[in-house]
Amino acid sequence: MTTHVVVDCEASGPCPGFGSMINFGAFVVEPSLERGYRSPVIEPYCETFDPRAYAAIGLSREQHVATAEASLEQAMKGFAAWLTETSKDRPVFWSDNPAFDWQWINHGFPSAGISNPFGFSARRIGDLYAGLEQSPRNTQGWKNLRRTSHDHDPLNDAKGNAEALIAILRKHDQLEKLIK
């Protein structure tokens, strides 16, 4: 059985090299939504950052530094261990915006000396929704299916996105096909 995982990242910039990943959350896509993972707050590892990125999540650089709990390497090793525990084979990465979230995770794993367990691909929830709804321009409507508030806490955001993905798959009789 392939394990599908929804991931959400918060960062202090638009991409690695222009900011640091602050923290991330993940949920296994399953009806119970019992298996979630919250990374520790990661020490800034890039001197460059965008104050607007911090403002968007209600944090400052000073608060980030003061609340940091782990190095990037420690955070990624913890996530890799959780993925190994929850996945028998290569997990599938899902996100609201994999162009953003996947790049941080993909940068984090090799920075920690770990191969990316997800490989080199990711799936975007909005594209699946638009395709199943047969409405190619409607890539945002799925966000109304979240039950957990989207508040820039990455665990809450990952859970809300997983809830929406499950609702989409149920509506189109695809959930059982995905999780078997």
Residues covered by each model-derived region:
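Conserved non-catalytic scaffold segment of RNase H-like nuclease domains
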Residues: 1-99, 148
